Each structure stands twice: as C-alpha cells, then as structure tokens.
Amino acid sequence: MPLSYQHFRRLLLLDEEAGPLEEELPRLADEDLNRRVAEDLHLQLPNVSIPWTHKVGNFTGLYSSTIPVFNPDWQTPSFPNIHLHQDIITKCEQFVGPLTVNEKRRLKLVMPARFFPNSTKYLPLDKGIKPYYPENVVNHYFQTRHYLHTLWKAGILYKRETSRSASFCGSPYTWEQDLQHGAFLDGPSRVGKEPFRQQSSRIPSRSPVGPSIQSKYQQSRLGLQSQKGPLARGQQGRSWSLWTRVHPSTRRPFGVEPSVSGHTNNFASRSASCLHQSSVREAAYSHLSTTKRQSSSGHAVELYSIPPSSTKSQSQGPVFSCWWLQFRDSEPCSDYCLSHLVNLLQDWGPCTEHGEHHIRIPRTPARVTGGVFLVDKNPHNTAESRLVVDFSQFSRGSARVSWPKFAVPNLQSLTNLLSSNLSWLSLDVSAAFYHIPLHPAAMPHLLVGSSGLSRYVARLSSDSRILDHQYGTLQNLHDSCSRQLYVSLMLLYKTFGRKLHLYSHPIILGFRKIPMGVGLSPFLLAQFTSAICSVVRRAFPHCLAFSYMDDVVLGAKSVQHLESLYTAVTNFLLSLGIHLNPNKTKRWGYSLNFMGYVIGSWGTLPQEHITQKIKQCFRKLPVNRPIDWKVCQRITGLLGFAAPFTQCGYPALMPLYACIQAKQAFTFSPTYKAFLCKQYMNLYPVARQRPGLCQVFADATPTGWGLAIGHQRMRGTFVAPLPIHTAELLAACFARSRSGAKLIGTDNSVVLSRKYTSFPWLLGCAANWILRGTSFVYVPSALNPADDPSRGRLGLCRPLLRLPFLPTTGRTSLYAVSPSVPSHLPDRVHFASPLHVTWKPP
C-alpha cells in the first residue's frame, strides 16, 4: 500500500504524538528506510516511457522561452544627464572626513571601470539588431535605433567616427581629454598611452580627428588656413602628419578605409555624402572625392554608392549620395515605391550627426560584438521599452572571462542586519548601471550598431540575395520597395519625422558607461553602491543605510527623523552626480520590502507576490506525470527561494535537486506533492539571531552521544554505529529538544553550517524542523564539555566555557559599522536631529 501523507508526516516526526526523540530520530538515518520511502513516493526515478511534460503553469523549460510581445507604441525612456563626479572621493572626504581603505578601493574601481576580455569576436553589422520580432521587423529596427540614439545623446554611448576616433555627448572626463590632447592608445594590444612625436616643426598643433568634426576650440587654434591649405591641394603626406599617424603599409587619405564585406566606413564617406555640409567641410573634403575610389580594396567604400555616370547632375551634391536620398531622383517603381515617401520632405536633415566631443580610441573595426533588441521595461510597465544587450560571448567558450565574485548577504545576515524597529524608505536610483563610466580602451570590445535600413530589410527578405557588387546599380535601389515596407515607414514617419533618414544609415556605437549585458557590471555596481552606503552610514550615524545593487534603503528610529535624513541623504547623493527618481521613493513604515523579502521586527518572510506564485504553481502541478527536468529547475528555483521559511527547508527539495542533477524527468506522487504543498502553505518567519552565552554543548562518537546542559551531563548510545556527521547532527537535535536552548556548542563543521542536505533524506527533513531557529557556536573538541559523556565517561566534569555568540552580518559590506539599533523603542526617542541641532558645515 502506498505511503499516505498522514503516515509520512508521522514518520518525519512532524506530528505531536511521536515517540521519544532518542529512539525515533536515529531510525530516520537508516538507509533501508530512506530507500523504501523513496520508492514508495516514486522518488527513485523509474525508466519513463510516458512523454515528458514541458510546461507547468507559467514554467517552461529553459529552451522553450516565452514568445516576447512587440509593442508598436513603446515609449523610449528618457535618460537624465547622468554624470558621476570624477572627484567623488574628494567630495566624500569633504563631507565625512577620510575614507576607509575599503571605500577608496571600491570607488577607484569605478573611476573609470576597465574591461579586458581574453579575446573578442567581431560580428557583421547585420547582426547588430536582432530580428527578434519577425512580424515587426522595420518597426523594431527604428524603435531600437531611436533607443540607441537616445543613449548616445545622453552620453551613455560613444559613436565610432573612424577606426581610431569616436564622438560623444555630455561632459567629458579627464581620461577622455587625455586622449584628446596628444596621448592616445596605439591599437588594441597596447593599453598604455604614448605621446605623439612631432613629425614636422611647421605644424603648430595636432588634432586627433578629421576636419569635419573639429570642435570650435580646435578650429580657432588651427585656423581655417591650415584646413584649406594642404588638404585642398591634396598633399596627402602633409595632411596625414597633421591629422594622425599612419602605418607605412596602409597609407591612405584620412577617414577612408578598405571596405570590409561592403560595410560602410561610418564617417568620412557619409559626411561627404551629406547634402547639408558647410562650405568649410566641402573644401576640406574636396580632395577626397578624387581619391576615394582608390581605397585599398577594389570597390567604393560607401555602401549605397552610385557610379558617377548614373547620377543626374554632379553639381547638385557630392558623388557618393546616400541610399535614402537616391529615391528622390529616381522614377517611382510602383504605388508603394519609397520615392513617394522621400519626396514628402525637401530637407531630410544630415546623413549623420557628430557628438560635442571627439576622442582618440584604440583601433575599432566596423563591426559589432553583441546584438540588441527591445523588450518591455518590466512585467508591470509595458508602455516603456528596455534595451537588451547580448554580450554573452564574453561568458562563453574557451576564452570566457571569469567575472569577479562579490558577497551577497544571505537571508540570516540580512535579517540580523535589517530586522529592527526602524522606519524604512527605499530610494530609486534611475539607470543605475549608466552611472559608472568605462575607460575608452574598452570601446572596441563593447560595440553595438546596425548596418542601415536597406541592408537590414534585404537581409531579412529571403527572396533578395545581397551581392556586394550589386550596390552600384539603380535597379538594385528599388529591390527593397514593397507594400509592407512602405506602409511601415509611412506610419513611422508620423513618429520620427525626418529622423527616418538619419536612422536608415549604418552606425556603430561603443559603450561609454557600463552596459547591463556584461558579467562585470553587477560586480561594479555592487562595489559602488556599497561604498556610497558606507559613507552615508558614517555621515549620518543615526541612519542605517544599506544597498544591494541599485536598491538603496534608509532606516531611522522615527518617521520624522527618517524624513529629515531623506532630504539630507538625497542632497548628498545628488551632489555626487547620482540621479534619484523622487517619484519612485517608497516609504515602507516598519516592515521593509527588500530583495523579495518583507523584513520587520518579527523577522523576515517572502513578499506576497512570491507566495501567490507558489500557490499557483502547486495548483497547476500535475501528479503521476513525468516533468521535464528543465521545468523542475524553474519550479525548484521558486520553491528554493521560500524554502528557509518552511518546516523542513531545503532538504525537502532534495529529490527534485537529484533529478535535475541526473537530467531525468521527475514524477510527483500525490503524497510528495501534498507534503510540499502543506510545507509551503504555512510559512514561518526567519528571526534575527540574538547575542548570548552558550550554556548547552553536544558531542557524539559513531556509537554514542553526550550532552552538557549547564552543570548536568547526559549520554546515550546508538543501536548501530553511524557516520560521524550523522551522529553529531542527532546529538545537536537531542540537545535542542531536551534543553530548548537556541544556542548550542558543537565541534562539527557540517552541523555548524546548518546545511542538512547531505544527510539521509528523512533525517535531514526532520532535523531541519527540530533545529529551526537554533544558532551554533564552534567549540574545539579538546574544550567541549560534552566530549567525555559522548565517550561514556560521566564522572569527569570539565568546566563550562564562557563562549559568547555574536550574530554575523556575513560578508556584507558594512565597513563603517552602524550604531547598534535598540531592540525596543524607548518611551521618548532622543537623537541629535538635524531639525533641532544647528548644522555646521563639515
């Protein structure tokens, strides 16, 4: 007869009417009993002939992901002008006095952040925007381009101008200016800076970039004479020595590169193609129109170039016109020809935009290193989009980067730290990742972009195969005209207007701030916010500030104090250049919602939405049907989060873990499902540990156990010899049940770790419930008062040790120690409030 749920509960000693613990508990360590129970509950995985279930409720296997939904009305979020102050360490020191070594080290890590992958794989530009939404290809293309453009305008991306120069918007950092005024990085292999060597004494100063993108400052220093002179006469040798150093093997005019598989050089060729260039720029580029076709590979550089013979009049504009503007001069091929759209506007704006600042960068190919696509900002906000950047190449393969590890507070540390009678609020840091600047040397490794609209559309329509040499013909121009494209562009014209032209051009962008798709970013963000919170805790000694990634919480003893702290802390953070979103500040009262938990003075529980998810999961969980182990991973992930709040904890999930490890299907028996369901319907809070003196000690040998409870000594023997770890665990359980003490001394490291997953399954489940809420103190065997009783010697009494226990907050970054928080509120709270005490500047 199969094991019923009631029998199973009784077996696990979860019911009140169980026999004496010293007799019942060792039975659960018996391997034979564990095997019989496992077989009865189908936990011994049979060879299954029934097809596996690949979907349980919302949980699907990792390889059958949910289909993302495209929203044509997505709003691109706006990014404030985020600029973290470079002298952040000095500012903090002015505010709070000298920083600790740990705080300084962490802040230096992100000023600027550096990224050195082992090797970088470059992908063609066509892979820049992922065809994630096959039904909305064009719409997705423009939405993504607009998002990238917004990021560039906000100073979060660099725009590759040539292989060795980039432009950006926003305020420059000194390491970016260093690159501008002389020293530059010589190729990807060299990271050190090397000053320019003067090649000709007649040239007064060196500009790192071409004439069309000089800042006004440089133009005034160089004067227009130097631009028009040597450049207009086409003396390439001298113009080279003015603009950049050249390798003798690849001597060619500035800004022109050999075209690689038909990709555009993003800068000079398109600048020349702009119909809206200033006369100065035209003069500066006049010599290029004659030399451009002699670039080192046979065909022209510009993607969509037309041979001179086919342009209607060369006087109207430069020879190499752009794909979009060519439609203006061509005959419409049908009612849905793009020329109808292009002729709607006389002035489509420039073909390309340049940033406010220009810098020298290591050699950057016209390629991307990761693809991008858009998704909903989060499950609760589908109106705004979020950019997903896939730089997974750095986490895969033989050349993968092992990201630095950092301490994340575990549940007990978090409870010890935050479970108190404080009032809480949480701050929302807007676009937290984009606060941290990246060194320009990282740019060649973190490239995103797109190959331009025509190539993107052509690549996705299966009927037209692109051959690079076809680009020159007019007939080829109309190959991309279709009703679908025309209708999409007409609708998008309402949204983007003349920007359609700008976005239809190819572009390559590199990250100037850390992107979310790289494993280094969470580490850097965690270091940064933990250092800032450490500074805040010392600046405001009555405040408990704590952070995990971009989630920052403040706690104070009363609501009034919290409000005044909130004002002071926000002003301090704003003065460092950290952008907070005041609309998203949440005031939690006395129970804080943080990292998926609700933390109050009573302890910690999972948030309501997680318990709802668990209930829903059990409702949809099929019985007696094999479930794909990848779906089990998802189920275990959810149940594992709430496991510490259940009676039996993680050990109850061990059968699931075992099947995932063996990559086999798992079948839920009615009893096992009922057992788990009951476990998760009643959740118990995890309480904070209290400091205290240890009075109860346990010890065991394979054959017997011994306890020291105050001055009392006890001993007992096992029916059969047991493995030493199992014996020690049993002794700890007996100590807890006999004394009721929440603090037990033991010399066994496995018991100390409170991880009972490696014990026989039934024993692990029962022990977890008996020892729930118990704290352990390590006592060396030689000093353990329970050592003698465990060996059967009751006559000798070792003196009790004075073993103090201090709850740990783990390796969470509390470098500046917070003042201790009283466990109860006194009748009248007195604190040095900024409201009552006159404030003196630091």
Swiss-Prot record:
It holds the Pfam family DNA_pol_viral_N. Residues 184-238 are annotated as: Disordered. Mg(2+) binds at D428, D550, D551. PROSITE patterns: RT_POL. Activated by host HSP70 and HSP40 in vitro to be able to bind the epsilon loop of the pgRNA. Because deletion of the RNase H region renders the protein partly chaperone-independent, the chaperones may be needed indirectly to relieve occlusion of the RNA-binding site by this domain. Inhibited by several reverse-transcriptase inhibitors: Lamivudine, Adefovir and Entecavir. Multifunctional enzyme that converts the viral RNA genome into dsDNA in viral cytoplasmic capsids. This enzyme displays a DNA polymerase activity that can copy either DNA or RNA templates, and a ribonuclease H (RNase H) activity that cleaves the RNA strand of RNA-DNA heteroduplexes in a partially processive 3'- to 5'-endonucleasic mode. Neo-synthesized pregenomic RNA (pgRNA) are encapsidated together with the P protein, and reverse-transcribed inside the nucleocapsid. Hepadnaviral virions contain probably just one P protein molecule per particle. This is Protein P. The lineage of its organism: Viruses, Riboviria, Pararnavirae, Artverviricota, Revtraviricetes. The gene is P.
